[in-house]
Amino acid sequence: MTETTIFQKIINEEIPCDKLYEDKFCIAFNDIQAQAPVHFLVIPKKPIITLLECIEQDANLLGHLLFVGSKIAKSKNLTNWRTGINTGAESGQTVFHLHIHFLSGRKMNWPPG
């Protein structure tokens, strides 16, 4: 059996979060380990570990996650932000439930690592 992640516990309302948005497909909340003045996550309610596990039927869901993040960013009057998905431990993924980072409020450097 797969370990229940902190994100699944948030989805199940077992632990609180600073929720920004929720619908039947996803939930968005502020990152508790913010790396920028604005740093929120959008996660699917479907338990997908990484992009590697996505299948063709997930394409609309992935687009929805990006759309929701953009909608939240616009509601915060953001005009510049970075969007990122870490896939696997070596990329920096620490919670193994797919999530999209939206960061803003400071100049982003490249390369990011």
PLM regions: where:
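HIT superfamily nucleotide-processing domains
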Residues: 1-113
